[in-house]
Each structure stands twice: as C-alpha cells, then as structure tokens.
C-alpha cells in the first residue's frame, strides 16, 4: 500500500482501512503467539501500513 494511494481516499475510507489493518494485526499476533504464523514478515508490513494510514489521517486533520 502506497502513501500516495492513501492520500486519495476520504477520511471515512482511511478509518475503515485502519480498523481492518488493526484487526489483521491482532490476528497475526495471535497466530505468532500460538506458533501458527509461517510468514513473520507480514507483522512488520501490517505495522508499517498502519503507520502510513495514521500519518495520512494526521496530514488530513492538519490541512
């Protein structure tokens, strides 16, 4: 997910995207805790996507 794509979305779409990413992060953390997660790099990718969405939301709030 690119920041430029996120900047084109509305605040409501960004909030729903953030909610989906947080749910996905929770599920991945549970899989990691139980030893079921095979691709551990997805945790890092989701965490960075969450940061991107939050950054764009902050930019939109300030503008």
UniProtKB/Swiss-Prot annotation:
Keyword Ribonucleoprotein: yes
UniProt record, GO biological process: translation
Keywords: Ribonucleoprotein, Ribosomal protein
Gene3D superfamilies per record: 1.10.287.310
GO cellular component: cytosolic large ribosomal subunit
Keyword check for Ribosomal protein: yes
GO function term, MF aspect, one: structural constituent of ribosome
Pfam families attached to this UniProt entry: Ribosomal_L29
Stated family: Belongs to the universal ribosomal protein uL29 family.
NCBIfam families, sorted: L29
Protein name: Large ribosomal subunit protein uL29
């Amino acid at each position: 997910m690119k920041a430029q794509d996120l900047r084109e979305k509305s605040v409501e779409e960004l909030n729903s995207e953030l909610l989906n990413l947080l749910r996905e992060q929770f599920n991945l953390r549970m899989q990691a805790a139980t030893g079921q997660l095979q691709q551990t790099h997805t945790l890092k990718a989701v965490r960075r996507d969450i940061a991107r969405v939050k950054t764009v939301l902050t930019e939109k709030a300030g503008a």
